[in-house]
């Protein structure tokens, strides 16, 4: 074993070889007083035969190798996990890697944009999860020849994500930003395949591109009809369209596109169309049309006309174009009223004979030549007014107003202006609308309510989109009110979709 002095000399020699121009002297190296540098000593090999150092170096080497192997194994596991998550995400979002090309031809006769440009059309697979009050959901896939992956993993995701859903739940693709098509900055029609919660508060998002929604039932609109196949709980949506109107639509709409745009006017007010589109995106900050209602239109077209996904994509472009047209008309200050609703006389079968309406009619001259400004219809005591008000989400909410005690000489009027908007006013004895006064009516969500036990509504008028007069349930009060009216002038009044018709 070398001594300490020999080891120091060897190190000094090695240092001098590294920097021959500037010799470095170690602290423990003794330098002679002579001017000439000392002769270099011969390099000595360090041959350490100590087994303890070898074992120590070997253990360090083994530790480093094991650490590297562990890191490599973790990286491989992470890569496998990423691939698995990517496959699951593709399965959930029904992502297609080879989108087809379809021509967008022949817009709607009601004003949709016509173009012959080619557009990208991603036809997603739609997976419907049906849960009819059972413990385990039944997965039913709609026919899609472009994808054959099984949706079993999705069922577990749905079961864990939505523990409290009721009736039917639909899972469909909601496109991301890259799937939106930029026409005037706000097309993005792929989003109409998404489904949101219509009137419910239980919709949840599994991921960025998947939305869960509970389908509605017949109890939501007992007087309405089904969109789609009423015998297939996976392909139907309940709507507020009455049977007579649905028959009228089916009779007059001979093409799928015309029926889709007609249903759009029945289900969404033009004001809602003007501030909305299918995707809820765009430079104007528009809201999304209720996806459940759009899904109902889709089911109805598939059921009635047997359209394909490519046809549905083209129809969605026409729906977006119709919304843009309504937005432009609103920006220009033009009327948004649906003229066909005013020209069409609804069938008397829409309401039963027992639904006798009590009202004071306007003069006959007013019926023959309606004034351009407004039409007025007075309501009597104990009259019940049924209000269908459209919310911001495009859904029709049904409420009732029970006309209470109207002071002598005063009355409650329904006013329809030239734009088709309806209002309810409290009019005084001088014929002027009482500003800031209490409307002589109370609101109720129970159609069977007969008493006037609620608090009066504040304000001089109520803005509504649809109004129809419901049957009088309090016959005693109705008889008293009838004595004050002219018995020969009590025609049946039908107010439907913003247009008041007198028969």
Swiss-Prot record:
Positions of region (DNA-binding): 350-399
Residues of the BEN domain: 234-330
Sequence ranges of Pro residues compositional bias: 360-371
GO biological process: chromatin organization
Record keyword Nucleus present: yes
Bridged cysteine pairs (disulfide): none
Residues found modified as N6-acetyllysine: 283
Keywords: Acetylation, Cell cycle, Chromatin regulator, Coiled coil, Cytoplasm, Developmental protein, DNA-binding, Isopeptide bond, Nucleus, Phosphoprotein, Repressor, RNA-binding, Transcription, Transcription regulation, Ubl conjugation
Residue span of region Disordered: 174-203, 335-371
Transmembrane segments: none
Phosphothreonine: residues carrying this PTM: 345, 360
UniProt modified residues of type Phosphoserine: 19, 98, 108, 347
Subcellular location: Nucleus; Nucleus speckle; Cytoplasm
Protein name (record): Protein BANP
Lineage summary: Eukaryota, Metazoa, Chordata, Craniata, Vertebrata
Gene expressing this chain: BANP
């Amino acid at each position: 074993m070398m001594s300490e002095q020999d080891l120091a000399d060897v190190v000094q020699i090695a240092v001098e070889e590294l920097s021959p121009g500037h010799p470095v002297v170690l602290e423990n190296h003794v330098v002679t007083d002579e001017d000439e540098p000392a002769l270099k000593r011969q390099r000595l090999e360090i041959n350490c035969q100590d087994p303890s150092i070898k074992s120590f170096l070997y253990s360090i080497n083994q530790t480093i190798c094991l650490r590297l192997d562990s890191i490599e194994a973790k990286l491989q596991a992470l890569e496998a996990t990423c691939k698995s998550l990517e496959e699951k995400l593709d399965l959930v979002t029904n992502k297609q890697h080879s989108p087809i090309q379809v021509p967008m031809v022949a817009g709607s006769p009601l004003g949709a944009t016509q173009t012959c440009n080619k557009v990208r059309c991603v036809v997603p697979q739609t997976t419907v999860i049906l849960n009819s009050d059972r413990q385990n959901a039944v997965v039913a896939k709609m026919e899609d020849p472009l994808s054959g992956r099984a949706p079993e993993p999705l069922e577990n995701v749905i079961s864990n994500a939505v523990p409290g859903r009721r009736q039917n739940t639909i899972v469909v693709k909601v496109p991301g930003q890259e799937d939106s098509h930029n026409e005037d900055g706000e097309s993005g029609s792929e989003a109409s395949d998404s489904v949101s919660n219509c009137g419910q508060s239980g919709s949840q998002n599994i991921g960025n591109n998947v939305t869960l929604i509970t389908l509605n039932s017949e109890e939501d609109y007992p007087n309405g009809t089904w969109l789609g196949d009423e015998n297939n709980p996976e392909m139907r949506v309940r709507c507020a369209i009455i049977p007579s109107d649905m028959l009228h639509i089916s009779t007059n709409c001979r093409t799928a596109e015309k029926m889709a745009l007609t249903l759009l006017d029945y289900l969404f007010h033009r004001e809602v169309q003007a501030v909305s589109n299918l995707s809820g995106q765009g430079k104007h900050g528009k809201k999304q049309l209720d996806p459940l209602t759009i899904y109902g239109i889709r089911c109805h077209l598939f059921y009635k006309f047997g359209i394909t996904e490519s046809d549905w994509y083209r129809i969605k472009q026409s729906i977006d174009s119709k919304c843009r047209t309504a937005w432009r008309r609103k920006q220009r200050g033009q009327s948004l009223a649906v003229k066909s609703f005013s020209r069409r006389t609804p069938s008397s079968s829409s309401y039963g004979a027992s639904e006798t309406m009590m009202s004071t009619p306007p003069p006959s001259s007013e019926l023959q030549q309606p004034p351009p400004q407004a039409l007025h219809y007075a309501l009597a005591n104990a009259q019940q007014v049924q209000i269908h008000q459209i919310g911001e989400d495009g859904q029709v909410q049904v409420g009732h107003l029970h006309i209470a005690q109207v002071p002598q000489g005063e009355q409650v009027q329904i006013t329809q202006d030239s734009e088709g908007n309806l209002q309810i006013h409290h009019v005084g004895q001088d014929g002027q609308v009482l500003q800031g006064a209490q409307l002589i009516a109370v609101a109720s969500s129970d159609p069977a309510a007969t008493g006037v036990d609620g608090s009066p509504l504040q304000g001089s008028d109520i803005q509504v989109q649809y109004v129809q007069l419901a049957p009088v349930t309090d016959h005693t009060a109705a008889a008293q009110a009838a004595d004050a009216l002219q018995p020969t002038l009590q025609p049946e009044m039908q107010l439907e979709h913003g247009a008041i018709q007198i028969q």
